Amino acid sequence: MRKTIKNTILTVLLLSLGISTALLTYLHFFASNDKDLSGEWSADLDITEQAAITAFSWLQDIEAVSVSLEDMESYMESYMHGLTIQVNLAFEQTARDEGIFRCYVSPESYDACNQAAYEAFAAAFLDLLAERLHMAGYADNVDKEAIEALVTETFGMSTVTYLMTYAPALLPSLEDLQERYDGSGTYEVSDDILTRYFESDEGVILKTEYYIRKDTDLILPKDSGSVFSDSFSAFDPMIYTLEQTQE
């Protein structure tokens, strides 16, 4: 079983890397040379695959029932059309090719994503529990409402609360994401390189990365020091979209 999980993750890794490489290659040749990054940008940090893998691994312990990683991804994608956390990035140009910036993870978006992830997890858990009870010859009603009532009676809490309390975390913590993405300071651009100077209590932290500007899209590589547990997520670029202001 563990070998099957490993092979599945490897397949997803290769597909993700191939798609990301093709996207970046295309944009590299067709991107504009606009160095003015001024404006409010936002990106959706997709954690659907990580949440699905974590839930999938935990659900393997339910005896005599089967669930695939694809099944878990379907559950996760049925909520909010996938699980994403909004990251906001603002640039204000103060001189030619330089200015100030601010980046932060939306706490409200994180809370909504976390809730949706566990609701999807609970839906899968209840379906598998109903299947297990049916196989064991449980004669009473095994629809979702009845199983939810059974879980509440057994554990003294709802399925979502039970999974939040006793199952593994489906998302990186908000603190970890804030440590990775939040910050402000000054920036400068040169050719295809964006350099940001993050101001912190320890001093100034320098971060240099290639960027691609294509109309209202700004593509940045995901941080190689990603807080995500699944290795393939580090290959996905972050695609920020410029928020249009009404004139």
Model-predicted segments: where are they?
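Lipid interaction determinants
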Residues: 10-247
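Positively charged n-region of N-terminal signal peptides that target proteins for export
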Residues: 1-7
